[in-house]
Amino acid sequence: MKIFFITSNASKVQLANERLNRYGIEIIQHKADLIEPQVFDVETVAAEKAKQLLGIVKTPFMVEDSGIYIEKLNGFPGALMKPVLDAIGDSGLIKLMSGESNRNALVKSVLAYCDPEKDLIKTFTGNYNGSISESIRGDMTRGWKVAKIFVPAGETKTLAEMDDMEWQKFLGDFRKDDHYEKLGKWLKSAFA
């Protein structure tokens, strides 16, 4: 089965292929101009992006959106992570958390799968709990916008501080039930 991934990010396509090939799914990059909905909820953003493409893309496709929800900030910035980080950076988020003891945060990633022939949009969510560090730490972003300030649950290092072995352990834990895994399992059962 082939699915278009509507993204300009080739690294996302490579990751999707790594994750979904074992389910017999080939991911092909396709670029399209999308209006990014400026709403708080990543599920809404992913579904709205998929709806924009329903009449344009004729074969199965998927879009992705991610956000970080900081508990003490009532979930801010959520799906607005990219524009917020572009505006205030990691240091701005750290400053917003100044003096706060509750630094809990949730990284949420959503894939919206769309089959235009069936007029179907289905979303798959992956969550990862952690906290916001008190300072910017580490050098490796590893493709995560919040890598220098996000500390995974049960860890003491930010993602950017992790060595390769620690990073692989984190990925292994994250991937057990992430959005790619959920999509792959669903497609396997739906088209078996």
Which residues does each predicted region cover?
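Anionic-ligand binding patches
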Residues: 2-4, 11-192
